[in-house]
Amino acid sequence: MDAEKKSAHFRQISSYKPQLLVLSSIQENPSSKISEKANIKADNDAEIGVFGAEKYFSMKLDHVDSTADITKQHEKENTHDHPNANPNPNPNPHPHPHPQLTKTTSSRSKTSRHGTPSVRSESSCNSQTFLMRINNHNENKQRKMNDTSISFGGFRCYGPCSGVKTVHTDPKNSCKSRNSDRDFVAYDARKHNDKPRLHFEAKKADFHAQEKISLPIQRSDIAMNLERKLSLLTWDAIPNQLSTKNNNHNNNGNNSSMSSNTQEEETASVASSDLFEIENITSSVYEPSEASIGWSVVTGSMADQSVISDFDMMKRVTRNGPVVKTKPVIGEKVRSAGFLSGCKSHKAVSVVDSSRKVKETAKVDHHEMSHQKKFKTEIRIQDLSFL
């Protein structure tokens, strides 16, 4: 049983031997292989330079090629070292029993690109990325411009019209443009200009016809306006409409009718002036009646009475003369048992003076009234004396 286990273990080790050899060879001499590949790549970069960017536009990355070359070289070395070894004596249904080993190899192959890159290689990589961006940007612009088309005349321009390929002609549009040119050459301006001229002539004829109808009325109105302006704004100078019509009618007749027209105008002016004059309509004189005489006597007596009353008022003012100032007499003090004192106020003392003045004025008024009654009776007797 132990011998069988050992043989099985040996078989497994023999099946993984090529992979272990590959890893051991990479670990033992990594710098020599990478340095050789870096020198080869540096020489290629030196030959290409910055301006040989055509290789980079093919969108192929260098690290993929380098990893493929490295794996091929390792396989060749393994075949030279072990020519009689079977790569897979016992095929395993699982092709990758150790995924960690495969991951490490792939990661190392990817990371082991060039070693230490030179300044020229870095500049070439930077120029590569920059030029790739510019190229993609220009391609997008060209696609957008190709989508839009500009048409003018008989040509159609797809995008910017910089090259011959971008210009395309449409035969239909060109035929239309040629036909339109021919129509423009055959265009006759006289036919189209006749319409406005005929329209203007028709309007002119209508205008003359209206003038012929309305000329007599307008002339008479003009004559009336001129005569009014030339006149001095007097009632006699304003012409009558009937007289102006008669004048226009008689201008074609004999000169003998002018005198009759002037007479008619004079009579019309006199009639118009009579409206503003006041005439004496009541020329006859009537005898006065008794009622009118009585009314005149009453009005006259009232007028005389008003005059006499005014005269009496003037006399009264002159008779009175200047006003005499009276001093109030203060009464003696009267002793009383109560708290009341004697009358010391001026109002209580002046009552006697006011009563005296009222009595005097009453006497004067009575005398004047008696005198007026006598005068009225005398006036009435004098008025009735003429009957």
From Swiss-Prot:
It comes from the Eukaryota. The keyword ATP-binding does not apply. GO terms for cellular component: plasmodesma. Disulfide bonds: none annotated. Residues 242-261 have a biased composition (Low complexity). Residues 74-83 have a biased composition (Basic and acidic residues). GO terms for biological process: phototropism; red, far-red light phototransduction. Probably involved in the phytochrome signaling pathway. PANTHER family: PROTEIN PHYTOCHROME KINASE SUBSTRATE 1-RELATED (PTHR33781), PROTEIN PHYTOCHROME KINASE SUBSTRATE 3 (PTHR33781:SF3). This is Protein PHYTOCHROME KINASE SUBSTRATE 3. It comes from Arabidopsis thaliana.
